[in-house]
Amino acid sequence: MTPISVTQLNNQIKSIVESHFEIVLVEGEISKVVYHSSGHLYFTLKDENSSINCAMWKSNLTRMKFRLKEGEKVYVYGALSVYVPRGEYKIIAQSIEPSGVGALQKAFEQLKEELSKLGYFDEARKKSIPRFPRRIAIVTSATGAALQDMLRVAGKRWQLTEIYLFNALVQGDGAAEDIAMKIKLADEFVFEDGSGFDLIIIGRGGGSKEDLWPFNERVVADAVYNASTPIISAVGHEIDYLISDFVADVRAATPSNAMEIALPDKNEILLMLDEMKNAFVYKISHLIQKKERELIHIRELLNASSPVKKLDMKLQECELLLKRFNHSYINQIQKKEKELNELKNILFSLSPVIKINSFEKEIELLKSTFKNKTAQIISSKEKELINLKSAYETLNPKKREKKGFAEITKNGKRIDLKELKIGDIFDVSNADVLIKSKALEKIEN
């Protein structure tokens, strides 16, 4: 037998192994996982008795939906490859699937766990949805049924909100990146008045897990998390839960439900406004009635104690006295005239001319005296009435101030000069000016 070199032997082994094991599907447990900076993946696949080194090149690794972890059981699909310089062989993996669970589900669970630890799902960071949004941005496909469903609901509930579409791919290659870009664009959009969108809705209609997968991608989760605008996630049907649902501020069961959450119902608002109006009218009416009763009470108190009221009462008393006076003297005059007539009759019956003349003079004197006395009394009462009116004018603070008088108050109350003490702070005011004063010296007259 002719001897061969080590390299020759390894090359022969390589030729035999790689030609006979072009495709292998191996089940085992993951260990020694290394994600290299070059983008390649290196790991060991083992069972109870053996192990084999494995590698997955960057070109295939980019298609994996989940990351390998120590201790996981997987199916590795690939081919055997021999490294001639060291005589080592390994599996060059083309794809890796979790054992017992689908790759997509595994990727979903891994990303969900990772984002949860990072605080992406914390309720404390989530923003509230505005009750009356002025502008809403919808990130979805322009040709999808989800958009039409949302517009139909919006037309029924509330027509005052402006709705803008950011057309995006919602499935297939590049969809996740396109959705993330449109979320960022809507979040940073600024109108001419300086304001942005009040709310963003992302979503699409139902579909398979693969169809909905873009909303499970990390790039979409990051875009939702970093947005300053409140976001509603409305993907698929009620039974579908996506990563975007957990990160968004609010999760809607369907796109139609998202619009029901986002917009108020005009009929409910009208009913609420009607109830508020009725309650307001009732309260105002009740308040007006209460204030009217208080006003009447205050007027009664003012009328009972006002100088005008007192003056009116004095005037009425004077008028009553004048009436009584006039009535009394008229009666006396009538009585004297009656007596005079009687005397005249007696005198005429006796025909003593001298006595008649004497009585006539006496009567004339009585008349003159009566008239003078009456005039004096009337004049006296008129003067008394004038004095009462003058006293009223004097008591009126505004009249006094216009005549040069000033009012002295302390702590908002009128006070006599005699009541002031040295050091007291008081106000001196008339109709035009108020002077803050302090008593420095007190001299009694």
From Swiss-Prot:
Leading EC class: hydrolase
Catalysed reactions, semicolon-separated: Exonucleolytic cleavage in either 5'- to 3'- or 3'- to 5'-direction to yield nucleoside 5'-phosphates
Q: Which Pfam families match?
A: Exonuc_VII_L, tRNA_anti_2
Which compartments does it reside in? Cytoplasm
Extract one GO BP annotation from the record: DNA catabolic process
Documented EC number(s): 3.1.11.6
Please tell me whether the keyword Transcription is annotated for this protein. Answer: no
Q: Which residues form a coiled coil?
A: none
A single Gene Ontology CC annotation of this entry is: cytoplasm
GO MF annotations for this entry? Answer: exodeoxyribonuclease VII activity; nucleic acid binding
Q: Could you name the domain of life of the organism this protein comes from?
A: Bacteria
Matching entries from CDD domains are given as: ExoVII_LU_OBF
Keyword set, alphabetical order: Cytoplasm, Exonuclease, Hydrolase, Nuclease
Would you identify the family this protein belongs to, as annotated? Belongs to the XseA family.
Q: Which function does this protein serve?
A: Bidirectionally degrades single-stranded DNA into large acid-insoluble oligonucleotides, which are then degraded further into small acid-soluble oligonucleotides.
What NCBIfam families does the entry give?
A: xseA
Whom does it interact with, and what assembly results? Answer: Heterooligomer composed of large and small subunits.
Q: What is this protein called?
A: Exodeoxyribonuclease 7 large subunit
Q: What is the lineage of its organism?
A: Bacteria, Pseudomonadati, Campylobacterota, Epsilonproteobacteria, Nautiliales
